[in-house]
Each structure stands twice: as structure tokens, then as C-alpha cells.
Amino acid sequence: MAVISNKNSKSHKRNRRGHIALEVPNIVLDKTTGEYTVAHHVSPKGLYKGRQVVAAPKQK
């Protein structure tokens, strides 16, 4: 049978688990297209801050 070396109290355990929370992604409205995108990321159309940075993929 396993024996723990040091017991963690309820408060220590819950304090540690307090940092395991889901974060809401930072979504911003793109002024040029009017679509919502994740901040500091290139949009699926290849735009970043209203400029064409990456060639847009061809639509089928």
C-alpha cells in the first residue's frame, strides 16, 4: 500500500487547483472585414491588422 510522505491539507490542495481554470480567448472585431478573430493572430483569410500578410488559401 502506498504511503504519502507529506499530507496536503484541503486548503493547500484547493489553493493549488485554483490556477487550473479555463481562460477565455481574446476575441476582437476586425475593422476591415467585420469578422471576429483571435487577437495577435492571422485571420483565416491571411489578414493581420487589416493588411494582407499571408496569401489566402484558394476556396474550392
Curated annotation (Swiss-Prot):
GO CC term, one of those recorded: large ribosomal subunit
Transmembrane segments: none
Keyword Ribonucleoprotein: yes
Source organism: Oenococcus oeni (strain ATCC BAA-331 / PSU-1)
Sequence similarity: Belongs to the bacterial ribosomal protein bL32 family.
SUPFAM superfamilies the UniProt entry points to: Zn-binding ribosomal proteins
Aminoacyl-tRNA synthetase as UniProt keyword: no
Keywords: Ribonucleoprotein, Ribosomal protein
A single MF term (Gene Ontology): structural constituent of ribosome
NCBIfam families associated with the record: rpmF_bact
GO terms classed as biological process: translation
Protein name, entry field: Large ribosomal subunit protein bL32
